[in-house]
Amino acid sequence: QAAGAYVAFPKKGMHDWIGAIDINSLYPSAIRALNMGPETIVGQVRQTRTLASIDEVIASGKGIAEFWEGKFACFEYESVMNRDIGQTEIVDWSDGTSSEMSSAEVYNFVFHGGQPLMISGNGTIFSYASKGVIPGLLERWYAERKELQAKAKEAYGTDMFDFWDKRQLVKKINLNSAYGALLNAGSRFFDQRLG
């Protein structure tokens, strides 16, 4: 039930100002920035409210994409980032224990607890004390792709251009496929908390 890339529904009509954004290697960059990997997970804010709302939307005959329309993150993450003292969250820790905390307490634990932590939009708490395997691999692939792009640029107009361009494209596909592999139940790297 993870959301994919956000694509807004078009708004019909003439508009004076429009804009678009395309972030370079968005998903690989997010994985690297949050140090997302199974070995870096500290805890998971249980998505009780979010999953209940998703179930309601699906029961009404709508698709999961309609639930996520206009939303950036799960309800629990939003409460944490808003430092809601009246909202209770359950955090499932990587050691198998659980804690009840207010959303504000979760925020303070992550951002003011004196530990190198980060929280993702789905409420997963990651440590960045040491680089994760997957973020490290993506960093290497990204650097390799930049090298291949430079070689393709140098070879523009020669017989070698297609060779280097296709090689950099393979790296791009590897980079962009990593997020999908992490959230594909058939993948050996599957972990719902990463999505």
Q: Where are each of the predicted segments found?
A:
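Conserved acidic
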Residues: 1-195
